[in-house]
Design a protein with these regions (language model features):
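Conserved, single-site charged/polar hotspot
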Residues: 1-485
Length: 485
C-alpha cells in the first residue's frame, strides 16, 4: 500500500479495516472498501507493516480523480524521464524536502535520479506544463498536482485534480467544442458519469490511479480546455445519468449507422443494460428491429434509414480491399489479437469443431463471411477460410481491427475519399466478393453503444436540450445530482 508522504508499506497478514462513524461507533469493514486516493483515513503500523486502517465518515468535499499518464511512444505508463515547468511558480516536494521554483525554471527528472516520491504543486491558479510531452495542442498543461514515482526502473506520472476540472479537458478531447452547447453539456454529463463509475472501480488501483488519459478510458487533455468546454461542465455541475438504481454506464461514440448497439453484442458482457438495448434510431423514436439476418441488414444499409446521423459523411461508407491486402492485414495483426484474448480467435479442428489453439496462420484466403450479427446488425463473428487453417473471429473490434488497414481508401456518403484509419470505421458492415477483391459496405463510426456524438449535436441543433438528448440515447434514465464520489 502506498501512503502519501510516506511511501510504500507492506500489509500485515492480519490487516483489518474499520469504520469510525460521526457518533464515535467503530464497525468492521472490508479491504474492498479501500479506494484509490482515500484521504479520510488513519493507519495503524507496527514492525514496518500496516496492521489496520480506520476509515472516517466522509464529510462533503470536492471529489478528486487520479489520472496516470500514458507514454504515447510505447503505449505504456513508463517514462524514461520527464521535463516540466509551470504557468506560475511551483513547489517540488521530494520526501521531506520542499523547493520552490519560478515559472520559467524547467526541471528534468530521470529514472536514474529519482529515488523517492516526488510531488509537484503549482502556486494558486497555476498549471504544470510538461515540456517532454506533445499533444495535439503542443506541450500539455495540467491543473492539480503531479505525483512522480520510480516503478520498475521507469517513471510513473499521476495527475490528481478535482473531478470537475478534469472534465474541462475531457470534453474538448472527446467532442469538437464547435458543437452545439446542449450537445457539449450532454457530453459533459456522460464524461462525469463515466469518470464516477471508474473512480468507484479498481481497474488501475494497483497503480494508484482511477483512469489513464487514453482511449482505454476517456481521452484527457489531448486538446486544450476552452470557454465552451468549461461552460458545459460548469452548467451541468454534479449531474450524472442515473439508471437501474445506480450511475449509468454512459458510453459514447462518433456516428451511428442509424442503430444503437447493446453491450452484450459488442463487448460480450454477461447481460445487457435496460438503457442500452439494441434498437433502430428513427427520428425521435427508438424502434426494435432484428437485423441479425444478412439480407435484412444489407437492405437496412441500402435504405439509409433517416436518423439524426443521416447527414454525417460517415453515416455510410465503402472500401475495397484486394485479397493480397486483406491477407497482409490479417497476418500482421492476428497474433497480437489472439494474445489479447485467445478465446475470441478459434481454429477449425479435423472433426469440424473450433478451439483456441494459437494456430492462426491462414495461408491463402479462400473465403470471408459474416456468420453472426447482433440484433442491431453489428458483426460479432466472422469465418475466414484459408489454405492452411479456417478461423472464427469474435467481437466487432477484432473484426474491425483485422479487416482494416491504413492503406484502405474509404468513399464516404459526402463522396470524399479518406484513408489512414488503422481499423474499419465500425462493426456495421457487409462483405461482398468481387473478382480478387472484397467490398466492405458499412455505416457509422465507432462502437455504436450509447450516445452518438454527431446525433447529439443534430438533436441540439433542432432545439433539444441536454436532458432530452441523454434520455433519448439512454432510454429510461434520469438526470441526478451526485453530491460526492
Amino acid at each position: 500500500l502506498q501512503i502519501e508522504n510516506y511511501g510504500f508499506v507492506s500489509l500485515d497478514a492480519e490487516f483489518c479495516v474499520y469504520h469510525l462513524k460521526s457518533d464515535g461507533i467503530v464497525t468492521p469493514g472490508e479491504v474492498s472498501e479501500l479506494s484509490v486516493g482515500e484521504s479520510e483515513a488513519k493507519y495503524v503500523a507496527a514492525s514496518g507493516k500496516i496492521c489496520a486502517v480506520l476509515l472516517y465518515e466522509r464529510a462533503e468535499k470536492t471529489a478528486k480523480i487520479r489520472v496516470i499518464l500514458q507514454n504515447e511512444k510505447n503505449h505504456s505508463y513508463d517514462f524514461p524521464n520527464v521535463c516540466f515547468s509551470a504557468t506560475t511558480g511551483y513547489t517540488v516536494v521530494a520526501g521531506k524536502k520542499k523547493t520552490h521554483f519560478d515559472a520559467s525554471k524547467k526541471q528534468k527528472l530521470t529514472a536514474q535520479n529519482v529515488t523517492e516520491h516526488i510531488v509537484v504543486i503549482p502556486d494558486t491558479g497555476g498549471k504544470i506544463r510538461v515540456e517532454s510531452v506533445n499533444k495535439q495542442y503542443g506541450h500539455p498543461e495540467y491543473r492539480g498536482i503531479f505525483e512522480i514515482d520510480l516503478v520498475d526502473k521507469a517513471l510513473h506520472i499521476i495527475n490528481e485534480l478535482p473531478l470537475e476540472e478534469y472534465l474541462y479537458s475531457v470534453v474538448p478531447s472527446e467532442m469538437p467544442t464547435e458543437y452545439q452547447k446542449e450537445a457539449l453539456k450532454a457530453q459533459a454529463v456522460c464524461a462525469r458519469s463515466y469518470a464516477i463509475k471508474q473512480m468507484a472501480g479498481k481497474r488501475l488501483a494497483a497503480l494508484g490511479a482511477h483512469v489513464d488519459d487514453s482511449v482505454a478510458f476517456q481521452v484527457y487533455n489531448n486538446l486544450r480546455e476552452d470557454a465552451a468546454s468549461i461552460a458545459a461542465v460548469n452548467e451541468t455541475k454534479g449531474q450524472v445519468v442515473f439508471a437501474e438504481n445506480q450511475v449509468a454506464e454512459t458510453y459514447f461514440y462518433s456516428v451511428s449507422a442509424g442503430v444503437s448497439a447493446g453491450i452484450k453484442e459488442v463487448w460480450f458482457a454477461k447481460k445487457d443494460r435496460s438503457y442500452l438495448m439494441p434498437c433502430v434510431l428513427l427520428g425521435d423514436s427508438r424502434k426494435t428491429l432484428d437485423l441479425q439476418k444478412e439480407a435484412d441488414f444489407s437492405k437496412f444499409l441500402k435504405d439509409e434509414t433517416k436518423s439524426y446521423d443521416a447527414n454525417s459523411p460517415w453515416y455510410r461508407w465503402r472500401t475495397t480491399v484486394s485479397e493480397k491486402q486483406l491477407q497482409q492485414f490479417i497476418s500482421e495483426k492476428i497474433k497480437s489479437r489472439y494474445e489479447k484474448n485467445p478465446t475470441q480467435i478459434q481454429t477449425k479442428q479435423k472433426d469440424g469443431t473450433f478451439f483456441s489453439t494459437g494456430q492462426t496462420e491462414l495461408g491463402e484466403i479462400k473465403k470471408v463471411e459474416i456468420l453472426k450479427r447482433g440484433k442491431s446488425g453489428v458483426a460479432v463473428m466472422a469465418q475466414i477460410t484459408g489454405s492452411k487453417n479456417t478461423l472464427r473471429i469474435y467481437t466487432e473490434y477484432n473484426l474491425r481491427n483485422l479487416f482494416g488497414g491504413e492503406k484502405l481508401i474509404y468513399l464516404r456518403k459526402d463522396k470524399k475519399e479518406v484513408s489512414g484509419l488503422s481499423c474499419l470505421p465500425s462493426g456495421y458492415f457487409t462483405i461482398e466478393k468481387k473478382g480478387d477483391s472484397y467490398i466492405f459496405t458499412g455505416g457509422g463510426y465507432g462502437h455504436g453503444v450509447g450516445m452518438s456524438q454527431n446525433g447529439a449535436n443534430q438533436m441540439a441543433a433542432q432545439g433539444k436540450k441536454c436532458e432530452e438528448i441523454l434520455k433519448f440515447y439512454f432510454s429510461g434514465s434520469i438526470l441526478q445530482y451526485q453530491k460526492s464520489v
